[in-house]
Amino acid sequence: MDESKKNERLKQLTDIQYNVTQKADTERPFQNEFYDNVAKGIYVDIVSGKPLFSSNDQYDAGCGWPSFTKPIDEAEVIEHRDLSHGMIRTEVKSVEADSHLGHVFPDGPQDQGGLRYCINSAALRFIPVDKLEEEGYQTYKKIFE
């Protein structure tokens, strides 16, 4: 992502969006936009707009954050060891904008790969299926057909 474009986009973020994506903060569980979203669509990086997750892979993990079994394209996320807060975790970041997204844990549904991508709503923008074409994401309609 072009640095000037990224800087312009960062200026448009809310405080929570900026703190989550740029400072690796975590939003409060059960008090965020998408933890209980059941609409069909895709979730894109709030900074770059790159598609990251699909509602087809979303499930209620009971943790208070949107949870997914996998990203749409594994090449769009990168994982790093995270030793903050006295824990050993795996941080998930977006490749394009280097946004902190959340963490991935090995306690997801076993029949779907066993992973739980626990992602901050503040790092995402949701595009409903009926808006995919209008928003320029028409190639992703096929995953809902």
Swiss-Prot record:
Residues 6-129 form the MsrB domain. It is an enzyme of class 1 (oxidoreductase). GO terms for biological process: protein repair; response to oxidative stress. It catalyses: L-methionyl-[protein] + [thioredoxin]-disulfide + H2O = L-methionyl-(R)-S-oxide-[protein] + [thioredoxin]-dithiol. The active site is at 118 (nucleophile). InterPro entries: Met_Sox_Rdtase_MsrB (IPR028427), Met_Sox_Rdtase_MsrB_dom (IPR002579), Mss4-like_sf (IPR011057). Pfam families: SelR. GO terms for cellular component: cytoplasm. Keywords: Oxidoreductase. Its EC number is 1.8.4.12. GO terms for molecular function: peptide-methionine (R)-S-oxide reductase activity. HAMAP family: MsrB. Belongs to the MsrB Met sulfoxide reductase family. This is Peptide methionine sulfoxide reductase MsrB. It comes from Listeria innocua serovar 6a (strain ATCC BAA-680 / CLIP 11262).
